[in-house]
Amino acid sequence: MTTPSDLNIYQLIDTQNGRVTPRIYTDPDIYQLELERIFGRCWLFLAHESQIPKPGDFFNTYMGEDAVVVVRQKDGSIKAFLNQCRHRAMRVSYADCGNTRAFTCPYHGWSYGINGELIDVPLEPRAYPQGLCKSHWGLNEVPCVESYKGLIFGNWDTSAPGLRDYLGDIAWYLDGMLDRREGGTEIVGGVQKWVINCNWKFPAEQFASDQYHALFSHASAVQVLGAKDDGSDKRLGDGQTARPVWETAKDALQFGQDGHGSGFFFTEKPDANVWVDGAVSSYYRETYAEAEQRLGEVRALRLAGHNNIFPTLSWLNGTATLRVWHPRGPDQVEVWAFCITDKAASDEVKAAFENSATRAFGPAGFLEQDDSENWCEIQKLLKGHRARNSKLCLEMGLGQEKRRDDGIPGITNYIFSETAARGMYQRWADLLSSESWQEVLDKTAAYQQEVMK
């Protein structure tokens, strides 16, 4: 069995000097360790509460490569279970979502209540004349399930920090999406799913730390849609063009701490997002006063930004896209994209949000394709021996980190930096190399102290 010491994890990641060896994106042994020590120990997004509002409502998803079913209980609480029959490991729930009174295995007919208990075994007296202790054979339950302002997370590790502690300062940035209006948020429409032939860490890192790519990777989209407010017809919608926000922003920052990352621009416009249509930008202008009262000016104006909660939950402010990067091997990721909107928005505005998110960041989105092409091409190149063992530069903004005194929390840097990427890979390496969460937290504290010297 391959151990963390065999893999020399800390020789592959050097965050103090800004180095990463790309073998971390290709090695199958590293990937198997990730499934155990990252996806088996971290808080992972499962669903939004709006997707399972009534008792018996369920939603099927994954924790790493483990299929799980999330279900609303009769008392209103939420449980999650491994989507696997305890008899011969068959899946017990197939529909993406729905409402049910029981989950029945199609192989031999074992049936489970929505609370996970085994409630029926066909031909039980004849098949098990010696008796069967059904209370012992219920579905395997995810032991830790918690919600944060509508987002449901699960964790297999009972020794992990609670969800709120795990989120840390990224919660302040997350609230900028979840808490703009009274009533919170909801998921609009279904889930868009597609597969990208790249390692899961590429998209996670980009959403945590990489605004830098947008100037070049998305240059053609900006040019086609209209690079400035010049009165031309190259518009996304009434009153909104694709003028790059970095051309007019007052300032910008990147946050990177505990493996999480975020970046955004300081703007003076309540509709400052380059990829939304007229109905959406009008909605942001009309609701700005409420958002400012709830969040303050900085977060109310924060509509152009990128974010990732370690390991695989990403979102873009303003564009209304929330997505999960489900790992499917060292060289493949399955994207699940949701449209998340204010619950208080009108149906017309929600439809506009959905159209806008799909147009830019759906599977055929004009920006999504730029990103996917980059990640896939990198993954192809890393098939080469020298390519996957040649160190890459992760030095952007190295040594320039600071803590702000204006109420914006956490370790920050200028937006064009790799502070969040270095923090993400440090948390990644610490998890793979540690036997316990306490050891991880001790290493995190030491790393952050070193960063802020």
Swiss-Prot record:
It comes from the Bacteria. GO terms for cellular component: 3-phenylpropionate dioxygenase complex. Keywords: 2Fe-2S, Aromatic hydrocarbons catabolism, Dioxygenase, Iron, Iron-sulfur, Metal-binding, NAD, Oxidoreductase. GO terms for biological process: 3-phenylpropionate catabolic process. InterPro entries: 3PPDioc_HcaE (IPR054883), HcaE (IPR020875), RHO_NdoB-like_C (IPR043266), Rieske_2Fe-2S (IPR017941), Rieske_2Fe-2S_sf (IPR036922), Ring-hydroxy_dOase_2Fe2S_BS (IPR015881), Ring_hydroxy_dOase_asu_C_dom (IPR015879), Rng_hydr_dOase-A (IPR001663). Its cofactor is [2Fe-2S] cluster; Fe cation. Its EC number is 1.14.12.19. Residues 44-142 form the Rieske domain. One of its GO terms (molecular function) is 3-phenylpropionate dioxygenase activity. Pathway: Aromatic compound metabolism; 3-phenylpropanoate degradation. Fe cation binds at H213, H218. [2Fe-2S] cluster binds at C85, H87, C105, H108. The keyword Secreted does not apply. It catalyses: 3-phenylpropanoate + NADH + O2 + H(+) = 3-(cis-5,6-dihydroxycyclohexa-1,3-dien-1-yl)propanoate + NAD(+); (E)-cinnamate + NADH + O2 + H(+) = (2E)-3-(cis-5,6-dihydroxycyclohexa-1,3-dien-1-yl)prop-2-enoate + NAD(+). Binds 1 [2Fe-2S] cluster. Part of the multicomponent 3-phenylpropionate dioxygenase. Converts 3-phenylpropionic acid (PP) and cinnamic acid (CI) into 3-phenylpropionate-dihydrodiol (PP-dihydrodiol) and cinnamic acid-dihydrodiol (CI-dihydrodiol), respectively. Belongs to the bacterial ring-hydroxylating dioxygenase alpha subunit family. This dioxygenase system consists of four proteins: the two subunits of the hydroxylase component (HcaE and HcaF), a ferredoxin (HcaC) and a ferredoxin reductase (HcaD). This is 3-phenylpropionate/cinnamic acid dioxygenase subunit alpha.
